[in-house]
Structure formats: structure tokens, C-alpha cells
Amino acid sequence: MLYLLDAKRDYYPITRIPEFWEWLIYQGNQGNIKIPIEVYEEFSDTKDENGEKDELADWAYQKEVKEALRFNEEAEQDLVARITYGGYVANPTDDELQKIGRDPFLISYALKDIKNRCIVTTESSRPSRQGANRHIPDVCRVFNIRCINNFQMIREMDFSTNWKNSL
């Protein structure tokens, strides 16, 4: 199973649980966890209140991290369009496209191989939200794409802070 990660900032703090971030790099090198380039750019370019790259952006910018985690597959525009128009809004305005962001790209990579790929996001299902306000799990449900949260991924992949001892 390939786990495709969303770019939310709600993961464990890098300085508090560095083992998690090392494990992500390891799993990326093993081909088990990837972050599509469109999503990777969202958090690798973020700035803090002083205009400096924040801790996550600094981490993501490292060559070792990029090489391990960036998913080097091209998005298929017809799948991105299918997700956008069929999962969010049939005729989106520019403002709606801005609000939707890059989520259709993330979901399209999973749609390409739904048996072997799943989405990992911190977003939770909110079925009452419609249009550009829809959450990733609800759009995934429309297309029968498996979508889990990071805690489910951690359980499925059996992460622990002493993961290196099992190598």
C-alpha cells in the first residue's frame, strides 16, 4: 500500500518526536509513503510570522527529505478534472478553485490506483459541507478511495519511537 500524505501541519512536532520524522524519511525511501509535488510545495514554502521558513518547511527543504518523500509521478489532468468537477464543484469559479487548492491533485494520484494507494489526512469527514468547502475524506468517498488519518497510518504501519530496533 502506498500512503499519500496531505500537507497539513498537524503532525508531531519535529523537535519533540524526531523519530517520527526519521521514520517518514525511511518509509519514503522504501516507497511506502509519498507526498505529491503539488502538495509538497504547500508546506515546503511556508513562512512563520517573521517571514522565515518555519520548522516544517526547513525540514521539507532538506535534500534527503525531498528525495525520500516527493512523489515523482505526473498528475493526470483528466483525473484532476474528474475529482474537481465530480467531487467538489461542477462549474467552479476562480474563488472556489482557490479554496479547493491542491487537494484534487492529491486525490487524483490515489484514484489512479485505488487498490494500492490511500490518502492520509488530518481532515475529518464533514458530509454537510458542500462545493469548495468539502473535506478530503468526503471527496474520497465519492470515488471509493480509501482515506485514513495519520493515527490509522501509524497503527497500520506499526510505527513506534524505537522503530530502528526492528530493522
Where are these regions (language model features)?
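Active-site-proximal, substrate-binding regions of enzyme catalytic domains
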Residues: L2-R117, S125-R126
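Acidic, PIN/NYN-like endoribonuclease modules and their adjacent C-terminal/linker elements
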Residues: N116, S125-L167
